[in-house]
Amino acid sequence: MLSDGQPAPGRRGALSAAVAAAVAPLLARSAASTAQLLPAAALLCVLFTAALTDLETRRIPNRLTGAGLLVMIALTALFEPNFVAERLLFASLVFAFFLAAALVRPGGLGLGDVKLAAVIGAALGAASVIAVAFAFSIGALVGAAIALARGWRHARAVALPLAPFLAAGSALTLLFGG
């Protein structure tokens, strides 16, 4: 346990790195250069760690989202300096969209999800819109499957963590559409 009461993410981080390494050959096929591959792999590490943590604890640590945001901006500045302003803009826009959603319906969307969305915006820029659309589509399909399996009344009581869907949507965007 860490001082903030959250479990240490070491095991999840190692698993996330393994998943990112396994996905790297697929990313390499879709990435035009190392300048795209390294940030994509770093993003996947952050996203899969967040997804596993969210599934296990229903929380996304500030350390993870804060470090993820800094790493994404630093990698952009290093490899694609002309895109830093765009990435910061989309990090802000996606953050604002998710924050508005969290404020409209308190308890429906956690602030960890809001901050994780900013990491996605910083990493993907304009393609973050596609990633979020994929994430919500996948989440809607899973929600519909739960509703079919449990019945609508019981399905409404099920709270799904969003980070796994954000990770899946971003991975699909990296592999096929971003």
Regions flagged by a language model, labelled:
Residues 1-178:
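A membrane-topology feature that recognizes alpha-helical transmembrane segments
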